[in-house]
């Protein structure tokens, strides 16, 4: 049975606290996996997966990124990384968790897994902190042409200036995710594309 311990550590932004969890096996650990979750997720959402891995000897750690889960201390902070260098701070927080965990398990192989938004954070992490993990798993990633990204960024920036950068924008959300569900019509929910499991979709 997995042992789970939740804790907080200071964010690299110098203001926030980052919520995290560590799952440990009953027996001697064989490796460490750090998870970088996706947008609108949180680390504890991966608890069943983490518990499965502990049965095979893994230590698993996952934090809630800035603006997510228990790292978002106010409703206004939900999905908001911050006013300055937010992406950088999220990646630096991932590195801080890695350093904290590696200090506890210095001799174990260390792996980093990023899903969806977490995959892009992981790619940035590998550029900023090369050689600090033994391997990486990049799931649900992709890329877009600058010709598509630039207008989307301009629309998001304009929406932020008009309504506030912590406000929810249906237009920006539609631009980011709207096309995904078209492949799964007729749709039961707005996020049918997320998983083949209806339970996973409903819990999300």
Region locations from a protein language model:
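Serine-hydrolase catalytic-loop signature spanning alpha/beta hydrolases and amidase-signature enzymes
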Residues: 35-48, 60
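N-terminal cap/lid segment of alpha/beta-hydrolase-fold proteins
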Residues: 1-27
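Glycine-rich nucleophile elbow surrounding the catalytic serine of serine-hydrolase chemistry
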Residues: 114-124
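Alpha/beta-hydrolase active-site loop
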Residues: 82-102
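Alpha/beta-hydrolase fold nucleophile elbow
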Residues: 105-116
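Active-site glycine-rich loops that stabilize anionic/oxyanionic intermediates
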Residues: 30, 37-41, 116
């Amino acid at each position: 049975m997995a042992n789970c311990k939740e804790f907080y550590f200071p964010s690299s932004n110098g203001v926030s606290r980052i919520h995290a969890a560590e799952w440990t096996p009953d027996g001697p650990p064989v490796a460490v996996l750090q998870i970088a979750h996706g947008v609108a997720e949180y680390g504890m959402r991966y608890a069943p997966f983490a518990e499965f891995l502990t049965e095979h000897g893994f230590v698993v750690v996952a934090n809630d990124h800035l603006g997510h889960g228990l790292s978002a201390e106010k409703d206004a902070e939900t999905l908001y990384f911050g006013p300055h260098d937010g992406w950088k701070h999220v990646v630096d927080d991932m590195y801080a968790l890695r350093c904290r965990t590696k200090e506890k398990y210095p001799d174990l192989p260390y792996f980093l897994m990023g899903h969806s938004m977490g995959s892009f954070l992981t790619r940035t992490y590998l550029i900023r902190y090369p050689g600090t993990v033994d391997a990486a798993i990049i799931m649900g990633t992709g890329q877009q042409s600058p010709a598509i990204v630039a207008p989307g960024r301009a629309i998001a920036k304009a929406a932020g200036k008009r309504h506030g950068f912590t406000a929810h924008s249906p237009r920006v959300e539609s631009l980011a995710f709207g096309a995904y569900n078209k492949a799964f019509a007729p749709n039961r929910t707005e996020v049918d594309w997320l998983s083949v499991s209806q339970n996973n979709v409903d819990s999300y």
